[in-house]
């Protein structure tokens, strides 16, 4: 595990941009595509700022999924896709709309909407992309970019939620999210933990109390802690000094320039 702390968010963004470019280039060189899953929240803004400082990224070879998504229209202010479209997909040239995988808007016309159907259809999109390249039971993303809530949740994997026990489905519905909107879909824990690389991006003083628990407490059952602990050699944290204020200094590493 590598935890990188920076004096301000702009430096977090710069390092994240360099990290993502490196992962993109290595993946494209290895198998011709860069498979990525994004979260919402503050992450897209930080990522967009970081990508803007990089040159030569082959966005046309990015296959983009969402680590979780709210079951709302694609132009809704709560949609992770809408946020990423505004800040990233519309801003940088090269993205192929066919390679940006959203929830199926046709399923949102059902009354009532069935979150299980939305999750199942999204899983079919994963199967279509990964079936030819992966013989394992779960897809193996090149990179997952995740956030971490003040409660230690990530994606829509919330503490003590039954979805944490799901070990068959790749995508699961969540119909009782503790934060609105309540209906969502999320990648399941086995999918997240099988990624080639995972990067958490967490900033602000509001995260300083949770980070020691998810990073340094190896008995924690919080989702972000479980993911980190199961992927120590493949997990990186990009944080600012406000968020890392309560971490042991020995936990921090210098980001390679």
UniProtKB/Swiss-Prot annotation:
InterPro entries: 6-phosphogluconolactonase_DevB (IPR005900), Glc/Gal-6P_isomerase (IPR006148), NagB/RpiA_transferase-like (IPR037171), PGLS (IPR039104). This is Probable 6-phosphogluconolactonase. It catalyses: 6-phospho-D-glucono-1,5-lactone + H2O = 6-phospho-D-gluconate + H(+). Transmembrane segments: none annotated. It comes from Schizosaccharomyces pombe (strain 972 / ATCC 24843). Its EC number is 3.1.1.31. One of its GO terms (cellular component) is cytosol. It is an enzyme of class 3 (hydrolase).
């Amino acid at each position: 595990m590598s935890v990188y702390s920076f004096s301000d968010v702009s430096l977090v963004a710069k390092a994240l941009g360099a990290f993502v470019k490196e992962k993109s280039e290595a993946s494209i060189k290895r198998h011709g595509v860069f498979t990525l899953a994004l979260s919402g929240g503050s992450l897209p803004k930080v990522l967009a700022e970081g990508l803007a400082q990089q040159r030569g990224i082959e966005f046309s070879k990015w296959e983009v999924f969402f680590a979780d998504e709210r079951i709302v229209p694609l132009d809704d202010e709560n949609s992770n896709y809408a946020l990423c479209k505004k800040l990233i997909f519309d801003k940088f040239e090269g993205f192929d709309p066919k390679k940006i995988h959203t929830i199926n808007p046709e399923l949102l016309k059902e009354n009532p909407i069935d979150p299980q159907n939305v999750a199942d259809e999204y899983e079919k999109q994963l199967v279509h992309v990964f079936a030819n390249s992966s013989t394992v039971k779960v897809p193996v993303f090149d990179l997952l970019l995740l956030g971490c809530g003040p409660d230690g949740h990530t994606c829509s994997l919330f503490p003590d939620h039954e979805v944490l026990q799901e070990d068959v489905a790749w995508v699961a519905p969540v119909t009782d999210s503790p934060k609105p909107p309540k209906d969502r879909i999320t990648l399941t824990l086995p999918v997240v933990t099988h990624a080639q690389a995972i990067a958490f991006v967490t900033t602000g003083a509001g995260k300083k109390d949770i980070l020691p628990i998810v990073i340094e407490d190896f008995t924690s059952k919080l989702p972000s802690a479980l993911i980190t602990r199961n992927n120590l050699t493949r997990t990186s944290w990009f944080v600012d000094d406000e968020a890392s204020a309560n971490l042991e200094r020995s936990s921090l590493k210098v980001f390679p320039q």
